[in-house]
Swiss-Prot record:
PANTHER family: DYNACTIN SUBUNIT P25 (PTHR13061), GAMMA CARBONIC ANHYDRASE-LIKE 1, MITOCHONDRIAL-RELATED (PTHR13061:SF29)
Protein's organism: Salmonella newport (strain SL254)
Name listed for the protein in its UniProt record: Carnitine operon protein CaiE
Record keywords: Repeat, Transferase
Record has Nucleus as a keyword: no
Gene Ontology annotations of biological process type: carnitine metabolic process
Taxonomic lineage from the root: Bacteria, Pseudomonadati, Pseudomonadota, Gammaproteobacteria, Enterobacterales
Residue ranges of the region described as Disordered: 179-198
Function: Overproduction of CaiE stimulates the activity of CaiB and CaiD.
Name of the coding gene: caiE
Amino acid sequence: MSYYAFEGLIPVVHPDAFVHPSAVLIGDVIVGAGVYIGPLASLRGDYGRLILEAGSNLQDGCIMHGYCDTDTIVHENGHIGHGAILHGCVVGRDALVGMNSVIMDGAVIGEESIVAAMSFVKAGFQGEARQLLVGSPARVLRQVTDQELHWKRLNTKEYQDLAIRCRTGLSETKPLTQVEENRPRLKGTTDVKPKSAQ
């Protein structure tokens, strides 16, 4: 892991969190229990404070940053998909930000909301609970259904389990030169594949 103090502020990481060795945490970063931070994530706490609350995840290639005197927060069980950018915003409890989405300064994503992949949430947007946000700029399409929220929670549970699995089962290695016979497949703990296109 790459941890850097900045002007006396040192990242804080709960011992039950998992931070991938290629992720970078700088300065005023606070990571809660059971958090998963994926490969190549960048958390630059060199201006504002960055907070990942318990059970949340920040996947591969995500970026967190914010202006001075602001907090960029992912609340409890928040789920941030691959390549998303969070800048000076707040993601509510149990909300999901889809892959390659951008959430701008002062925006608030309501609890149990879902931001669709590739969406752009404008600065200052003030969301409410259980909104499905889609597009660039993002607009409220409808309320999140119980089925969608259940699917989101299953996916978040997978990442909470992955944090545990990675703490014990991830190790740097050299690659094999050929595929071994009867190569096993990895399995998750739940069936999280989407049932149909939205």
